[in-house]
Amino acid sequence: MLEPNKGIQINEVEGEIYLVEFGDGRDKKRFLEMCPWTYEKYLILLRELEGKQVPKEISLWQSPFWMQIHNLPLKSQTRETGRAIGAKLGEVMDVNVAEFGVHWGKSLRVRVKIDIHKKLVRGKKIVIEGGEQRWIAFKYERLPNFFL
Protein backbone atom coordinates (compact mmCIF):
# COMPACT_ATOMS: atom_id res chain seq x y z
CA MET A 1 0.00 0.00 0.00
CA LEU A 2 1.10 3.55 -0.63
CA GLU A 3 2.44 5.47 2.35
CA PRO A 4 2.63 9.10 1.18
CA ASN A 5 5.40 11.42 2.31
CA LYS A 6 3.21 14.51 2.66
CA GLY A 7 -0.32 13.15 2.78
CA ILE A 8 -3.24 12.62 0.43
CA GLN A 9 -6.58 14.39 0.40
CA ILE A 10 -9.62 12.73 -1.21
CA ASN A 11 -12.76 14.71 -2.05
CA GLU A 12 -15.95 13.59 -3.79
CA VAL A 13 -16.46 15.60 -6.99
CA GLU A 14 -19.69 14.11 -8.31
CA GLY A 15 -21.36 10.71 -8.10
CA GLU A 16 -18.62 8.12 -8.10
CA ILE A 17 -15.88 10.55 -9.16
CA TYR A 18 -13.31 11.54 -6.56
CA LEU A 19 -10.41 13.96 -6.67
CA VAL A 20 -7.19 12.72 -5.09
CA GLU A 21 -4.66 15.45 -4.25
CA PHE A 22 -1.09 14.66 -3.25
CA GLY A 23 1.11 16.80 -1.03
CA ASP A 24 4.18 15.53 -2.91
CA GLY A 25 4.48 15.04 -6.69
CA ARG A 26 6.68 11.97 -6.17
CA ASP A 27 3.84 10.28 -4.30
CA LYS A 28 1.49 11.00 -7.19
CA LYS A 29 3.97 9.58 -9.71
CA ARG A 30 4.45 6.42 -7.62
CA PHE A 31 0.68 6.08 -7.07
CA LEU A 32 0.02 6.20 -10.84
CA GLU A 33 2.90 3.82 -11.63
CA MET A 34 1.46 1.23 -9.23
CA CYS A 35 -1.88 1.02 -11.09
CA PRO A 36 -4.15 -0.83 -11.35
CA TRP A 37 -5.61 -0.19 -7.92
CA THR A 38 -8.47 -2.25 -6.59
CA TYR A 39 -10.77 -2.22 -3.59
CA GLU A 40 -12.05 -5.67 -2.57
CA LYS A 41 -10.95 -6.86 -6.05
CA TYR A 42 -13.00 -4.18 -7.85
CA LEU A 43 -11.14 -1.92 -10.25
CA ILE A 44 -10.54 1.71 -9.33
CA LEU A 45 -10.10 3.74 -12.51
CA LEU A 46 -7.65 6.63 -12.30
CA ARG A 47 -6.87 9.48 -14.62
CA GLU A 48 -4.62 12.49 -14.34
CA LEU A 49 -6.69 15.66 -14.80
CA GLU A 50 -5.79 18.99 -16.33
CA GLY A 51 -8.29 20.91 -14.21
CA LYS A 52 -10.24 22.25 -17.20
CA GLN A 53 -12.66 19.33 -17.35
CA VAL A 54 -16.25 19.46 -16.18
CA PRO A 55 -16.98 16.42 -13.94
CA LYS A 56 -19.61 15.01 -16.33
CA GLU A 57 -17.06 15.10 -19.18
CA ILE A 58 -14.42 13.04 -17.39
CA SER A 59 -14.15 9.71 -19.18
CA LEU A 60 -12.74 6.79 -17.28
CA TRP A 61 -12.45 3.83 -19.62
CA GLN A 62 -8.81 2.74 -19.60
CA SER A 63 -6.58 1.10 -17.04
CA PRO A 64 -2.99 -0.15 -17.23
CA PHE A 65 -2.29 -3.85 -16.69
CA TRP A 66 0.79 -6.00 -16.90
CA MET A 67 0.29 -8.82 -19.36
CA GLN A 68 2.50 -11.81 -20.01
CA ILE A 69 3.04 -13.01 -23.58
CA HIS A 70 3.68 -16.77 -23.58
CA ASN A 71 4.99 -19.12 -26.31
CA LEU A 72 7.28 -16.57 -27.95
CA PRO A 73 10.61 -17.86 -29.27
CA LEU A 74 13.42 -16.69 -26.97
CA LYS A 75 15.01 -14.47 -29.61
CA SER A 76 11.63 -12.74 -30.13
CA GLN A 77 11.36 -11.67 -26.49
CA THR A 78 12.49 -8.12 -27.25
CA ARG A 79 11.27 -4.62 -26.50
CA GLU A 80 10.27 -4.21 -30.18
CA THR A 81 8.21 -7.42 -30.22
CA GLY A 82 6.55 -6.49 -26.93
CA ARG A 83 5.63 -3.04 -28.27
CA ALA A 84 4.29 -4.45 -31.54
CA ILE A 85 2.10 -7.09 -29.89
CA GLY A 86 1.02 -4.82 -27.03
CA ALA A 87 0.00 -2.05 -29.45
CA LYS A 88 -2.65 -4.37 -30.90
CA LEU A 89 -4.34 -4.41 -27.47
CA GLY A 90 -3.92 -0.82 -26.32
CA GLU A 91 -1.37 1.86 -25.47
CA VAL A 92 1.98 0.30 -24.55
CA MET A 93 3.45 1.87 -21.42
CA ASP A 94 6.44 -0.39 -20.77
CA VAL A 95 8.12 -3.63 -21.83
CA ASN A 96 9.99 -5.50 -19.11
CA VAL A 97 13.31 -6.46 -20.73
CA ALA A 98 16.93 -6.10 -19.70
CA GLU A 99 18.94 -3.07 -20.84
CA PHE A 100 20.56 -5.06 -23.64
CA GLY A 101 17.10 -5.57 -25.15
CA VAL A 102 16.23 -9.28 -24.84
CA HIS A 103 14.37 -11.14 -22.10
CA TRP A 104 15.31 -14.78 -21.59
CA GLY A 105 12.36 -16.36 -19.81
CA LYS A 106 9.08 -18.22 -20.16
CA SER A 107 7.14 -15.06 -21.00
CA LEU A 108 7.58 -11.42 -22.00
CA ARG A 109 5.90 -8.83 -19.73
CA VAL A 110 4.26 -5.79 -21.32
CA ARG A 111 2.36 -3.01 -19.53
CA VAL A 112 -0.62 -1.97 -21.65
CA LYS A 113 -3.36 0.58 -21.06
CA ILE A 114 -6.51 -1.38 -21.93
CA ASP A 115 -10.01 -0.20 -22.85
CA ILE A 116 -12.16 -1.79 -20.12
CA HIS A 117 -15.24 -1.83 -22.38
CA LYS A 118 -13.64 -4.40 -24.68
CA LYS A 119 -13.29 -8.12 -24.06
CA LEU A 120 -9.83 -9.26 -23.04
CA VAL A 121 -7.87 -10.97 -25.77
CA ARG A 122 -6.55 -14.34 -24.53
CA GLY A 123 -4.09 -14.90 -27.35
CA LYS A 124 -3.25 -14.38 -30.99
CA LYS A 125 -1.73 -16.21 -33.94
CA ILE A 126 1.49 -14.70 -35.20
CA VAL A 127 3.88 -15.57 -37.99
CA ILE A 128 7.42 -16.13 -36.79
CA GLU A 129 10.67 -16.33 -38.68
CA GLY A 130 10.47 -18.91 -41.45
CA GLY A 131 6.74 -18.34 -42.02
CA GLU A 132 5.59 -20.66 -39.23
CA GLN A 133 2.32 -19.71 -37.50
CA ARG A 134 2.34 -19.86 -33.72
CA TRP A 135 -0.34 -19.24 -31.08
CA ILE A 136 0.86 -16.88 -28.37
CA ALA A 137 -1.13 -16.79 -25.14
CA PHE A 138 -1.77 -13.67 -23.05
CA LYS A 139 -2.05 -13.80 -19.27
CA TYR A 140 -3.00 -10.67 -17.37
CA GLU A 141 -1.66 -9.92 -13.89
CA ARG A 142 -3.81 -8.79 -10.94
CA LEU A 143 -7.12 -8.79 -12.80
CA PRO A 144 -9.98 -7.33 -10.78
CA ASN A 145 -13.50 -8.80 -10.59
CA PHE A 146 -14.55 -6.52 -13.44
CA PHE A 147 -12.82 -8.77 -15.96
CA LEU A 148 -13.47 -12.16 -14.38
How does the language model describe each region?
Residues 1-148:
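Glycine- and charge-enriched interaction patches
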